[in-house]
Amino acid sequence: VLAVIVTVLGILAGIPMAIIIARKTFGKMPSVILDSLMNIPIIVPSIALGISLKFFWQGSGIPDFALLILAHLAITYPYFVRSMSAAIERIPIELEDASKTLGAKPFTVFKSIILPLTKYSILSGAIIVFTRSVSETGATLAVTSTLQTAPVLIVNWVNSIRVGPALVGVNTQTVGLACGLLILFSFIVLLALRLLTKKGKA
């Protein structure tokens, strides 16, 4: 559920930002600055980002689940924006200019030109956001101790086996099976992403 919400929010917020960066809506320098800012969550360790969010919003009354969504969105958002902005930059600006000359409004331009030509990039970006959110551990551990995602649950299982006492029904076979399922899931998603990328280039 968390990854789905983060993916939807990432798409809704990422498309406008990608257009602003790719088309230099506010000028060249602001676009360069925004593009550079997109790299920060990619460079900074996720646990550091999670801790900073926790300290910043601590005591604000925001529910842990909402804070977790915010943390995952901050981490995954740049991946979608960079993927989408690169796709938009490949679209000749003359197509949009011609459409605007004929009286098309910005949303019509997006719906008739940008969306059809970037649909595979949107889908591949969404897959990246989804898988990144599913696999995120550091920020989740930093933000909340009450909510557990699959990777955090596996970490807790491993700690219970190493430190003890082991949780009921949890052993090395259980942990191995859970890790194997996550790896299989990642492989399937990456394979789908690869096929989508090839289809988009065709």
What are these language model-derived features?
Residues 1-89, 113, 117-137, 142-145, ...:
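Membrane-water interface segments at the C-terminal ends of transmembrane alpha-helices
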Residues 40, 94-102, 175:
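Short hydrophobic faces within alpha-helices
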Residues 91-95, 106-107:
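Short glycine/proline-centered loop/turn elements that form peptide/ligand docking sites
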Residues 98-99, 109, 113, 154:
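Hydrophobic positions on the alpha-helical face of helix-turn-helix-like DNA-binding modules
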Residues 102-103, 116:
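Glycine/proline-centered hinge or cleavage motifs at structural transition points of membrane proteins
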Residues 103, 152, 176-178:
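Structured catalytic cores of enzymes that bind and process phosphorylated ligands/cofactors
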Residues 107-108, 117:
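Hydrophobic alpha-helical bundles that form the membrane domains of multi-pass transporters
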Residues 137-172:
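Glycine-rich helix-loop "coupling/hinge" segments at transmembrane-helix boundaries
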